[in-house]
Amino acid sequence: MGTVEKSSNNDASVTDDIRSAEYYHGMVPRQDAEGFLKREGDFLVRKTEQMPGKVVLAMSVRVTDELCRHFMLNMDPTSNKFYFEHTHQESTISELINWHMTTKTPISAASGAKIRRPMERSPWLINHDSIVANKKLGEGAFGDVFIAELDQGGKQEVAVKTMRAEATREARLRFMKEARLMRKYQHKHVVKLIGVAIHEHPLMIVMEYCPNGSLLSHLKKNKVSLIEKLRFTTEAADGIAYLERSKCIHRDIAARNCLLSAKNELKISDFGMSDNKDEIKDETLEKVPIKWLAPETMQEKVYTHKTDIWTFGVLVWEIYSDGAEPYPGLTKIQTRAKIVVNDYRMKMPDGTHPTVADVVTGTCWQKNPEKRSTMDSIHKKLREFYESKK
């Protein structure tokens, strides 16, 4: 029998036999768990927070095409045996699961839920012992960011975002939502998700490492040529156009959130505020970068794919101004007033290619969102112009 980490109220916690089981998915959220279970009888075991600070084990089962059920695993404090809802008991969790599978006995009489196929962990669910943190890069919204070495049959350098152990359940769900979104995206100008480590704390998002750092830092530290600025602009448009086609509203497009690969190729990163929706309402607008917001976001607290196009225009201004802060000399409050009340637009920096300036001022910064073009058409125009200049 594996070692039991006991928890109160007869709830079972992780045992050694479960930790190594292929159907154990760690702290995968309910929404992700249900997405993994495709056919009736598919099941997995996961950790879940029953109440603040109390993490227990649960089994998720696909009961019908439309319905998944979730069952707590319990331990009898007298016999030290495991059971579901006061039914059959076994000495280990794996033996209990095997009994229900082989006898085809429902997990509970009321649900009728039978388990048939264990859902093995996906390749992108990474074991913590495969990751060795090397150097701290900085701090993110949820925790620290590191350069690390990932060993999965071959070593590679990766970037790892961590989640503080003391983070709230809501913060953990946001963290996992970011990973879930990134998992969908495969594009040369979008940072690639390699996987997540969620069996224990700290939770980790493992991504491709971009050794040349942020675009903002590169612009500030180096003398960047006009043709390279045009390339950055075109690559950013390519990545954002892909996200638009993927129905992703990024909400935080800025030079600080663009990373550079070893070949200095631009990649869109940081999906902490993103979502797959046509419209997002944010009633608070807390901790948002005011100087990058579209007028309708400032006034109506709404984000759409068209607000990302406005923000792309601000990113282009950053690129051609060598990483200067937008609306120089203005506070956030002054910026908001000038845009909303006075319909103010920044002048594009000296040296900006006229074609690029026309895209920004004539398309991206249209007051009426419906008059802003699509990112696909913006990228097409910029790509053709860049090709003519190479």
From Swiss-Prot:
What Gene3D superfamilies does this protein map onto?
Phosphorylase Kinase, domain 1, SH2 domain, Transferase(Phosphotransferase) domain 1
Q: What's its catalytic activity?
A: L-tyrosyl-[protein] + ATP = O-phospho-L-tyrosyl-[protein] + ADP + H(+)
Which EC class is this protein assigned?
transferase
User: What's the superkingdom here?
Assistant: Eukaryota
Pfam families named among the record's database cross-references: PK_Tyr_Ser-Thr, SH2
Q: What happens when the gene is disrupted?
A: RNAi-mediated knockdown causes a disruption in the dorsal intercalation and ventral migration of epidermal cells, preventing enclosure and elongation of the embryo. Epidermal cells tend to round up and appear to be defective in adhesion. In addition, causes partial nuclear re-localization of hmp-2 in the embryonic epidermis and the production of supernumerary gut nuclei probably resulting from epithelial cell hyperproliferation.
Output one GO BP term: cell surface receptor protein tyrosine kinase signaling pathway
Query: What protein name applies here?
Result: Fer-related kinase 1
